[in-house]
Amino acid sequence: MTFAARAYDPRTGRVIDCLTTEPGVQVYTSNGMNGSVVGSSGTTYRQTEAFTLETQHFPESPNKPNFPSTELKPVQEFHSTTIFRFATDASLPPLPR
């Protein structure tokens, strides 16, 4: 398990740490949202109000021999573990070096 990312909100002190066995993390933001999408509770989703951390192999892995392989043979199983640890800044462990 490797430390992959930390998101921190200085206004609230909320923290999300991401630890994973995957070699990469894709970060997606809600920059394309304009308030036209409404959630089940009636909340609208607007620009800069959300993000996601998606752990995965690198998207170009099949084309880059120096990247970790994404080949999975028919008899093989794939296992991956990702942990999202939620905290406040008062309870933060130090970042790995």
Residue ranges: model-predicted function:
Residues 1-97:
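Active-site pocket scaffolds in enzymes
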